[in-house]
Design a protein with these regions (language model features):
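Phosphate-coordination loops involved in phosphoryl transfer and adenosine-cofactor binding
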Residues: 11-14, 81, 126
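Interdomain hinge/lid region at the active-site interface
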Residues: 208-269
Length: 282
């Protein structure tokens, strides 16, 4: 009796993810939720004997991407029909150049999302993905982004390092600002375990304002209002309770001034007074 070969549904993709860190694990979980057949392999286990996939995602540290590509090429394990992509923000598709000719194409597929924990994956829906590379690989990476509910962007001529620095400034800078803000809350009387829970929704509302309103309208607070007296009180309290945060506060307030001037809610005289206050306290 001849055994019939089981057919995959037409909309089912086979994905191999090499690297089971924060990004790799989060992508695996999200793709499985869409019905994709995902194999996740930790880099510490080394390369498998063979890979059966339509798309190979290399999710290792930036410095290891090219080495992994070279090793996969030498091992001959990437199917010729498959495409290979990496998720590094600071590297373009050329990091996977050793795999050209061994597969159907290579690309960068960087999700502009903050992956802080492998155990608690962030929401990917509506996040943006930067795609760059061979047309065949970009096409399949775009399909992956679509499955995840993400927005794919090719952005021709993009300065990759500037792009990555911008992402780091916002994602890492926001986390650092929140940590300083949490410490100030604690010194002001908020329980240490409560402070992050209070700041999370605040950050979420800022993110929503940035996405929906853009700049300069997303700015709120005393600089936008031209509240010189309020800023003086803030600085006095910071000097008393958390003096090491004063330079950070001054720098953040100075960065708000051009936005406040563009909005025009405050008088130029008040904004000039704020600029003078920040200069004197610096």
């Amino acid at each position: 009796m001849t055994r019939r070969r089981e057919r995959r549904p037409k909309n089912t993709s086979r994905v191999f993810i090499y690297g089971a860190g924060k990004v790799g694990t989060s992508l695996a979980r999200a793709l499985r939720a869409t019905g994709a057949l995902v194999t996740l392999r930790a880099a510490r286990k080394g390369l498998p004997r063979r890979i059966e996939a339509d798309i190979v995602i290399v999710a290792v540290r930036d410095r290891d991407v090219r080495l992994v590509a070279e090793s996969m090429r030498a091992a001959g394990i990437v199917p010729r029909r498959a495409v290979a992509v990496h998720v590094a923000g600071a590297l373009d598709a050329e990091a996977l150049a050793p795999l050209r000719g061994a597969c159907a194409g290579v690309a960068q597929m960087h999700p502009m999302i903050a992956f802080a924990s492998a155990r608690r994956a962030p929401s990917l829906a509506k996040g943006h993905v930067r795609l760059q590379g061979d047309a065949s690989a970009v096409r399949r990476a775009r399909a992956v982004a679509r499955r995840l509910g993400m927005v794919a962007r090719e952005l021709p001529g993009l300065d990759t390092i500037a792009y990555h620095a911008a992402a780091g400034l916002v994602a890492n800078g926001a986390a650092a600002l929140a940590a300083v803000g949490a410490e100030l809350l604690v010194r002001g009387g908020v329980p240490r375990k409560v402070a992050p829970a209070m700041l999370g929704p605040l950050l979420r509302s800022v993110a929503e304002n940035v996405a929906s309103l853009g700049f300069p309208e997303a700015l709120t607070g005393p600089v936008r209002r031209g509240d010189v007296a309020g800023l003086r009180k803030h600085l006095a309290t910071l000097h008393a309770k958390l003096p090491e945060a004063v330079p950070l506060y001054l720098a953040a307030a100075a960065a708000q001034l051009p936005l406040a001037r563009a909005i025009g809610d405050a008088t130029e005289a008040n904004l000039d007074a704020i600029a003078e206050l920040l200069t004197k306290r610096a």
